[in-house]
């Protein structure tokens, strides 16, 4: 079996890269070869690293049974038009490789991610244009155009929404299997006419042996960024974008700054809202710039610290940094999603502080998950946009440290019972095996 990947991203600075890495290790253990076509990476890389990647256009890794073909593409940047153009040009090149490249033509099945949203339609065209009509497995991590409606970028019935729905239907109709990351996703696409037998639910797992609790006295991030170990920390880890409701988070931090100076917020990541957030905090608060030993820069604005993405090998330190960790979004954004960072929070034995749309996440955090007979509360859930309830949830955990620890232990147990790396990767293996002849 030989698997073809046509991707707009490659490298360790993609949020879900550990999932792909775990999955691909499982594929290699089956004796399956993998062929990748992708643009030269730029996300999270220095100029020197980008130049180096452009020189090394084909990467062979016999141990991992992978061949990665990179084609030259301009850097991603933060401008939305520039990013959209990069995605479009990349998709055109990937289509060309998928149909005509010798290495791609020797593959038996395609495994395609849903990000960016045109990837599925591109893969469907590859399938149609190849004589062998190569089977196409679609991994649905984000539902488009629903996500655009949720962020307020468009509305149902608009021209953009109609185009998005056509792309969505074309993709679903041509996919041989669709892997979704939650029961909510499954219900969503079934309501759009996708037959149930085409859908497989595979939750985004966490490597329970990699993401573990790191005691505060051993957590190196406190020393790297000059954080006071005696404070109560609320952390956010991931994309700092337009949908994460950073405005509300800043309002809550401002309100707690005087009444509860021991509560400190730490945001680890980057994204489209990063520059706006830094400018906003600079205009309101006193800034302290921190130079970490590795050369990276961080900022502290009174009771809010902004740290850059950390290497994956430090993921346990990142998710163990806080006393509690956030899963947060604007209303309407997360109706059908359970962010995979939730599992990392739980695996690190930290309580989940969720301010999110009411969906499967609420059941899991409150301990009412129908998918587990042993589920117990592992945090506090509040409705997306409810600032007062969110602030009250923070104070509840701040005033009851034993409850924090209990929720953390419950979350870790839920992961061990339901969301281990072995369970998730085996489900992917089973899907691929269904296409073996």
Regions found by a protein language model. Give the residues of each.
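A short, well-ordered alpha-helix in the C-terminal region of glycosyltransferases
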Residues: 389-392, 396, 403-417
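N-terminal subdomain of nucleotide-sugar transferases
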Residues: 1-58, 256
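Nucleotide-activated donor-binding/catalytic signature segment of Leloir-type glycosyltransferases, i.e.
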Residues: 274-316, 378
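Carbohydrate-associated surface elements
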Residues: 40, 184, 202-205
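A short helix/loop element that forms part of the nucleotide-sugar donor recognition site in Leloir-type
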Residues: 52-58, 212-227
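Conserved donor-binding/catalytic core segment of Leloir-type glycosyltransferases
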Residues: 227-244, 250-253, 266
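Membrane-proximal helix-turn-helix segments that form the acceptor-binding/catalytic region
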Residues: 118-121, 125-131, 158-180
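Nucleotide-sugar-dependent
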Residues: 14, 244, 309-318, 325-346, ...
């Amino acid at each position: 079996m030989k698997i073809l990947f046509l991707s707009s991203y490659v490298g360790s600075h993609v949020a879900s890269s550990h999932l792909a890495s775990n999955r691909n290790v499982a594929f290699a253990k089956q004796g399956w070869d993998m062929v990748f076509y992708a643009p030269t990476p730029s996300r999270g890389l220095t100029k020197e690293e980008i130049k180096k990647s452009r020189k090394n256009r084909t990467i062979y890794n016999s141990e991992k049974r992978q061949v990665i073909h990179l084609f030259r593409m301009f850097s991603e940047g933060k401008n939305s038009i520039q990013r959209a153009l990069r995605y479009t040009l990349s998709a055109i090149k990937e289509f060309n490789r998928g149909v005509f490249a010798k290495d791609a033509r020797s593959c038996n099945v395609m495994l395609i991610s849903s990000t960016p949203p045109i990837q599925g339609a591109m893969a469907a065209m590859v399938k149609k244009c190849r004589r062998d009509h190569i089977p196409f497995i679609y991994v649905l991590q984000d539902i488009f155009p629903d996500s655009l409606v949720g962020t307020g970028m468009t509305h149902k019935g608009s021209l953009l929404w109609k185009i998005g729905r056509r792309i969505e239907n074309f993709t679903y109709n041509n996919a041989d299997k669709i892997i979704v990351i939650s029961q909510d996703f499954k219900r969503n696409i079934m309501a759009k006419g996708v037959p149930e037998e085409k859908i497989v639910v595979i939750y985004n797992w966490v490597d329970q042996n990699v993401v573990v609790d790191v005691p505060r006295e051993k957590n190196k991030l406190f020393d790297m960024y000059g954080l006071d170990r005696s404070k109560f920390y609320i952390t956010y880890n991931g994309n700092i974008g337009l949908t994460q409701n950073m405005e509300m988070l800043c309002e809550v931090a401002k309100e707690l700054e005087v009444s509860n100076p021991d509560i400190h917020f730490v945001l680890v990541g980057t994204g489209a809202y990063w520059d706006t957030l830094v400018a906003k905090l600079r205009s309101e608060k006193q800034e302290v710039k921190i130079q970490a030993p590795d050369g990276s820069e961080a900022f502290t604005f009174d009771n809010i610290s902004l740290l850059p993405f950390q290497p994956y090998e430090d993921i346990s330190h990142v998710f163990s940094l806080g006393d509690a960790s956030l899963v947060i979004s604007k209303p309407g954004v997360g109706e059908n999603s359970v962010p995979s960072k939730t599992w990392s929070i739980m695996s690190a034995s930290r309580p989940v502080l969720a301010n999110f749309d009411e969906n499967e996440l609420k059941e899991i955090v409150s301990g009412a998950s129908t998918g587990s007979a042993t589920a117990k509360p592992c945090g506090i859930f509040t409705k997306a946009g409810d600032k007062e309830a969110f602030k009250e949830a923070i104070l509840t955990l701040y005033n009851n440290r034993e409850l924090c620890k209990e929720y953390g232990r419950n979350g870790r147990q839920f992961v061990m019972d339901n969301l281990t790396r072995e369970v998730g990767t085996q489900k992917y293996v089973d899907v691929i095996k269904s296409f073996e002849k």
